[in-house]
Amino acid sequence: GELLDDLVAFTTKKNLSGIEALSAIPGTVGAAPVQNVGAYGQEIEQVLESVHAYDLKEEKYVTIKKEDMNLGYRQSIFNHGKDAGRYLIISIRIHLSHDRLTPPFYTSLQSYVEEHQITDFSPKSIREMVTEIRWSKLPKPEEMASSGSFFKNVYLDDQEAERLRSMNVPVWEGNKVPSGWLIDHAGLKGKSFYGMRVSEKAALILINESAQSYAHLKQAREEIVSIIEKKYGLTLKQEPVELE
């Protein structure tokens, strides 16, 4: 299938906006709606109109509109619920524009803009910044295997958000708490659990150093989740979908 990053590169060269912040995300275009991929303030659902897919249950091709995909934070009908795994996505239809992203940006992108005094916010410029930021923090798949971000960010109700703010935990727009921050400030960066190491660059990344089975990964996950629960009273959720 077509790589998502190749599509982003193509669209930014055409000066089209809508997915430039999704630069350098590994994976294919067809997989993007499955997790409703997103980064630096953009999500595929913001531009997605429909997908053309093969229904493995009914054995026929279908078109599924965005409003029927139950898109949410890293989820859709394609990976959650009774229809998970039912559809093989063949192509997607998206609507891009010539509008540009404008400041203030997502935290790390805004910091980069200010540090480097960037004034060009064209899709091509945003792509270049996001790519540099991403590879400064994340291991490149061809150099070190990982599943990417292993834990989802945490969404809170207003009461919980206030509790976390009182603990000096950053709470972003929409009452979102960055799980990477929680793991980092729990002192887990660089630590190993059952052969799985928390990346020194990005706390959301788990790297297999010596784990020999899924059981080791499960133990590592449970240990990290337990530490965060005890320190912050929050339960981290795994982002990668497990195949049975």
Where are these regions (language model features)?
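Anion-binding (especially nucleotide phosphate/pyrophosphate-binding) glycine-rich loop
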Residues: 1-57
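Phosphate/pyrophosphate-binding loops and the adjoining catalytic core of nucleotide-dependent enzymes
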Residues: 224
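Phosphate/pyrophosphate- and phosphate-bearing ligand-binding catalytic cores of soluble enzymes
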Residues: 61-216, 231-244
